[in-house]
């Protein structure tokens, strides 16, 4: 890419991206893999520190990405067609940022060139969660955390 060329995430709308470009927007933070609670009165989302059983603890990627929707029916499957409902994604999510007209943060792998930058910036769930089978699923309210909602810097 020359200096005159815009990176694809600035040059294209989300709906115009190729499948490879779309997939590369995921920074691997895995915040979308955390169990979320919705307040019945306000609709406000709260995140817990409990993660999906398919999350790979080391890479913070899905261990069965191709089959995730079959294995975990309520898994997040974000597409250009369901972007209207993106408010349930964390504020640091690249898809949400771009949909809101914002740019990618410095630690995003497409900007930094380093996959580890997400973790080093403290934007990943790495080392900060329990798996569903390790947690008391009857005490979800006791597992609510605010760090996934921190906006990107």
Curated annotation (Swiss-Prot):
InterPro entries according to UniProt: Puta_zinc/iron-chelating_dom, UCP006173
Top-level taxonomic group: Bacteria
Similarity comment text for this entry: Belongs to the UPF0260 family.
PANTHER family membership: UPF0260 PROTEIN YCGN
Protein name (record): UPF0260 protein Plav_0898
Organism: Parvibaculum lavamentivorans (strain DS-1 / DSM 13023 / NCIMB 13966)
């Amino acid at each position: 890419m020359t200096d005159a060329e815009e990176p694809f995430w600035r040059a294209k709308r989300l709906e115009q991206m190729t499948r490879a470009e779309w997939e590369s927007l995921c920074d691997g933070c895995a915040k979308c893999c955390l169990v979320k609670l919705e307040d019945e009165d306000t609709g406000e989302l709260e995140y817990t520190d409990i993660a999906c059983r398919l999350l790979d603890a080391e890479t913070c990627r899905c261990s069965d990405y191709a089959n995730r929707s079959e294995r975990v029916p309520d898994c997040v499957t974000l597409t250009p067609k369901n972007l209207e409902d993106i408010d349930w994604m964390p504020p640091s999510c690249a898809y949400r940022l771009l949909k809101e007209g914002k740019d990618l943060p410095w630690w995003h792998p497409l900007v930094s060139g380093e996959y580890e930058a997400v973790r080093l910036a403290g934007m990943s769930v790495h080392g900060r969660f329990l798996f569903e089978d390790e947690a008391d699923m009857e005490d979800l309210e006791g597992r609510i955390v605010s760090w996934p909602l921190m906006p990107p810097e």
